[in-house]
Design a protein with these regions (language model features):
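Short, extreme N-terminal segment that most often corresponds to the first beta-strand
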Residues: 1-32, 174-176
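Acidic, low-complexity, intrinsically disordered interaction modules
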Residues: 36-108, 156
Length: 176
């Protein structure tokens, strides 16, 4: 029984890889995504094959490749988008282009891009809300501070009110 949707009969063997190797890679790729991109599944063998698919030829080592593409939802989204945009060059007798096309179909079918768009947007929202909370804690007065400002004992005892300064808009002079 196969460990994923791909069977060796769906792929053409190359000089250096069997059809079973291609099916195993495709299934490992999908398992890697479904696992939540677990680093333990990003083995040297898997990295060596993945780094030669979907145009990923400029990465020099496994840790750099992993940190570039799989450490945040935004990075994972970029990875999936690149995989879908890749034109799958080559002949299946010499490359993994048949596996790339099959993976593109499966990525679309499983709706990974939309899922990671939502996850990436939520990560941005969470980060922005944390910043907002920090800024509000620093700059927004608390209800007790607001109450103290309304009934200031110094101004209420003297009967005078504080001077209010108006903020003027800056005027740009000529630079020449």
């Amino acid at each position: 029984m196969p460990k994923g949707p791909f069977l060796p009969s769906e792929f053409v063997p190359t000089k250096f890889s069997t059809a079973a190797d291609k099916a195993d890679f495709g299934n490992a790729f999908l398992h890697f995504i479904e696992s939540g991109w677990k680093e333990t599944l990003f083995t040297k063998t898997f990295y060596n094959r993945l780094s030669n698919t979907f145009g990923h030829i400029a990465h020099y080592n496994r840790p750099t490749f992993y940190s570039t593409w799989f450490t945040s939802d935004a990075d994972r989204l970029r990875f999936l988008e690149q995989a879908l945009e890749w034109p799958c060059w080559g002949d299946a007798e010499f490359t993994f282009c048949d596996v790339e096309r099959a993976l593109q179909r499966e990525i679309r079918k499983r709706n990974y891009v939309v899922r990671y768009e939502l996850k990436a947007a939520e990560a941005v929202r969470s980060a922005e809300m944390a910043i907002l909370e920090r800024l509000e804690a620093k700059y927004r007065p608390t209800p007790t501070q607001c109450a103290e400002e309304r009934v200031d004992p110094v101004t209420s005892a003297t009967g005078s009110s504080a001077t209010v300064l108006e903020v003027a808009s800056p005027v740009q002079g000529s630079l020449f």
